[in-house]
Each structure stands twice: as C-alpha cells, then as structure tokens.
Design a protein with these regions (language model features):
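Soluble catalytic domains of enzymes that build or remodel membrane lipids, polysaccharides, and related
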Residues: 1-162
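Selective detector of the "anchor" transmembrane alpha-helix that sits immediately C-terminal
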Residues: 161-186
Length: 188
C-alpha cells in the first residue's frame, strides 16, 4: 500500500493468506506446495514494527485484504483516525465472499468508531461510516469512482480502548458461575 503525501509512505502486509500467499511450514511442505503450483504461495510478510502512515495530517490504519479479519491487528494503535482497506477480491469470483469481506469491514468500522475507505479491484468498493453503514459503494465487478468528504472522528470506541477484555471477563465470570453451580449441585 503506497500513499503519496510529502513523502512516499509504504506499508507491507503483515498477515498473509495461508496457502494463497504463503505455505505454512513451507520447509516441510515444499513438495506439496510445488505440486499444487499455487502462484504467490511463498511471499514474506511485513514487519509488525512498521512506521505510521499519514495522508497529510491524518493517521491512517492501513489494512490489506485478509488483514481486515484480525481485530487485534487493526487495533494495534488506537490513535489512528481513518482506516483504508484495499483488497483483491477477484479470487472469490461470483460468490458471496466479496459481500462477506465488506461485512467484515463494516464490523471493524463499528468496533473502532472509524470511517473505512474500501477499495477493491473486482469486489465491492465502499465508504463505510463509523456505525457500519455503507454510505457509498461500487457494486461487485463494476468500474467506478467514489468521491466525498470523510469526517475524522476523535472519540474512541470502548472496544478500541479495551479490546477483548470485556469478552474475556464475561467468559471468566460464566466459567466461575458454571463451576460454582456445579459445586452446589454436587453437595445437595
């Protein structure tokens, strides 16, 4: 992903698609990978320690394709102001996958209280507001351009501040409740 501002800014994809962009345990599965003849199946991922990306004064959350499925990756720095998701959805063909990929971006918009600009080569390109609503879009397999103004939102969502802590606490208290209720049933 390259942004042009005063300087050229580069972001390298950190989460690669298994068996699509890299082969897990490649050293052990080399023969299988070669037999399957999957193009681009041995790419290298970008570093987790990449410099921030800016467009003018706006701090960008760059997300490439499959990375949008990882909340923790997107939330690695909750000071970012705008999420940009680019994707090659041509892999999916005429399936429901481009719609599901868009829905994942809608969830991220809600989770992080951020607008998302989503640009795809064949999938659904869209502007998604911080409530997960698609404001403008270009349908699947359609060429086009989206223009508009995107507000920068300063406030953070609870999820962007605390991540999975709430879910983990709920799980913990549920387990404690199950253990305690099992203990009392055993001693009745």
């Amino acid at each position: 992903m390259v942004f042009f501002s005063d300087n050229i800014e580069i972001y390298n994809k950190r989460k690669l698609v298994p068996f699509g962009e890299y082969t897990p345990w490649y050293d052990y599965l080399f023969e299988l990978a070669e037999a399957l003849n999957i193009p681009l199946s041995n790419l290298s991922h970008g570093s987790d320690d990449q410099k921030d990306i800016y467009f003018k004064d706006i701090k960008i959350i760059p997300v490439i394709c499959f990375e949008s499925t990882f909340s923790n990756l997107v939330n690695s720095d909750n000071t970012r102001e705008l999420m940009i998701n680019i994707s090659n959805d041509s892999w999916f063909g005429n399936t429901l996958a481009p719609h599901q990929h868009l829905q994942i971006s809608q969830i991220r918009a809600i989770e992080f209280n951020r607008f998302i600009l989503r640009a795809t080569n064949t999938g659904i390109s869209a502007v998604i507001n911080n409530n997960g609503k698609v404001i403008k879009y270009i349908p699947n397999n359609t060429e086009g351009t989206i223009t508009g103004k995107i507000p920068i939102i300063e406030s953070r969502s609870i999820y962007s501040q605390y991540g999975d802590i709430g879910i983990l606490m709920l799980l913990f208290f549920t387990l404690i409740t199950i253990v305690i209720s099992g203990f009392y049933k055993k001693h009745e």
